[in-house]
Amino acid sequence: MGHKIYTQLMNGVSHMLPFVVGGGILIAIAFLIDGLMVDMNALDVAERANFGTITPAAAMFKQIGDVAFGFMLPVLAGFIAMAIGDRPALALGFVGGMMAHSGTSGFLGALVAGFAAGYIILGLRKVCEKLPEALEKIAPVLIYPVVGILIMGLLMLFVVEPIIGGINTALNNGLTSMGSSSKIILGLILGGMMAIDMGGPFNKAAYVFGTAAIAAGNYDIMAAVMVGGMVPPCAIALATLLFKDRFTKEERESGPTNFIMGLAFITEGAI
């Protein structure tokens, strides 16, 4: 059972990674361009909030990268769902993933949506088996998408978003209340949150808090966030070089890619 869930999860992750890598590196280039071209000390608080889109070249890279990143959660949820319920589940997963992306449940919400979408289709199949043959034939093109997307949407709106979104909001509020406390303790917590779930709710909460600190002119908090986010992919890449016998040939070949992703601050590369 555990291996089956892992296989379904990795089907989503493997399809998601190209969007993460492409979008993440383009966004990193946008920040690099602004970092080289703009004097941060000359900007006011409102202008600092736009860091990464200040110069036209940076804004272009950021726009393209953001679009690619926007597909991350729908693709993750869609292909997890497809691994469970085959092609009819893909649409449900995409809808659930997009609702997680546009809402507050984020990465964890997309994971729940992917698995839920797959099992919704399995349930609908059992129900449709009892229908007259004429109705059963139109189920894949009519009943599965209409009823399935409706159930998926209601589940996201009334269960996943309130619960998981509430957890994410509580995390952000907790970090905000620590803003005036010891910066060393705050840095340790944020760095650990960035590294612990590699793109999940803890990671995203820490990143949002770090970007908010930049907008307020506090750069040292984001430094801790970035170091924590770079550790997992860089550590895995280093491990593939130092302990080659512990990894498969395919994993060893992906090691250098993880170095690049780590230096580009793409924590999800460790997945």
Regions found by a protein language model. Give the residues of each.
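Pore-lining transmembrane helices
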Residues: 1-133, 137-271
